[in-house]
Amino acid sequence: MNPIQLDTLLSIIDEGSFEGASLALSISPSAVSQRVKALEHHVGRVLVSRTQPAKATEAGEVLVQAARKMVLLQAETKAQLSGRLAEIPLTIAINADSLSTWFPPVFNEVASWGGATLTLRLEDEAHTLSLLRRGDVLGAVTREANPVAGCEVVELGTMRHLAIATPSLRDAYMVDGKLDWAAMPVLRFGPKDVLQDRDLDGRVDGPVGRRRVSIVPSAEGFGEAIRRGLGWGLLPETQAAPMLKAGEVILLDEIPIDTPMYWQRWRLESRSLARLTDAVVDAAIEGLRP
């Protein structure tokens, strides 16, 4: 297959549109369209859904994976020839809580490589693998232990969340000495964040009806919303600890939520991907529970 056409397909998916790809590649939108049509004609399949944003079809996902691997290996070959690790694109999927707590030391490691670049795709830990399956990323922080086809898995450790709220919010929902979990307003990071719902299943008898749910799609803002009484939420213990110590929030109970975390990456002979894996594992050893 034509590597230029594969690179164009990858640009469409990464930029989300034919127009975005044309800007990234410094070619006209019609040239982008012609390259994709030629590739589709070659494989005999439609590869891109012309939606907003543009998405790869099932056949397109196979080629996107191939294209991303090609780009990585080409960059590594170029770096080896020039004697340095440079201009190597590393794209991974990660959840917000990991990004805001234990993951930052990875930035130091990648920065020391010289010209390597790191692109993070933010997604709930229950859904990061979908990006890996589609070929959108090289690796993913996930709660799923079963490997995606063509990938290998490394256990990272356990992320602990604590159920917290302001004392006044807790007191407002105490009924006959018991906390009314179902009635108390709750916070979510986004529509895919079901951690609070899974946690609530163990605390409420029977199905939970309509609840007051606020969406706060920011790791820092989420903690701040809890601190200011917008609702209760599950916060990583490292973020909750300062607020608990200051008395700004309280534990709603003594039951922590422990989520095993894993790193899944393509099974690919790549020096930079191996180094990235080592960096992720080292950061997890320092920042997660065993």
Swiss-Prot record:
One Gene Ontology term of the molecular function aspect: DNA binding
Native species: Corynebacterium glutamicum (strain ATCC 13032 / DSM 20300 / JCM 1318 / BCRC 11384 / CCUG 27702 / LMG 3730 / NBRC 12168 / NCIMB 10025 / NRRL B-2784 / 534)
InterPro entries, per the entry: ArgP, LTTR, LysR_subst-bd, Tscrpt_reg_HTH_LysR, WH-like_DNA-bd_sf, WH_DNA-bd_sf
Mutant lacking the gene: phenotype: Deletion of lysEG decreases the extracellular accumulation of L-lysine, L-arginine and L-citrulline.
Keywords: Activator, DNA-binding, Transcription, Transcription regulation
Domain HTH lysR-type: 1-57
PROSITE patterns according to UniProt: HTH_LYSR
Name of the molecule in the record: Lysine export transcriptional regulatory protein LysG
Keyword Transcription regulation included in the entry's annotation: yes
DNA-binding region: 18-37
Coiled coil residues, start to end: none
The protein's role, per its UniProt record: Positively regulates the expression of the exporter LysE. Induction requires the presence of a coinducer, which is either intracellular L-lysine, L-arginine or L-citrulline. L-histidine also acts as a coinducer of lysE expression, but this amino acid is not exported by LysE. The lysEG system prevents bacteriostasis due to elevated L-lysine or L-arginine concentrations that arise during growth in the presence of peptides or in mutants possessing a deregulated biosynthesis pathway.
Encoding gene per record: lysG
Family: Belongs to the LysR transcriptional regulatory family.
Domain of life where this protein originates: Bacteria
Keyword Membrane: no
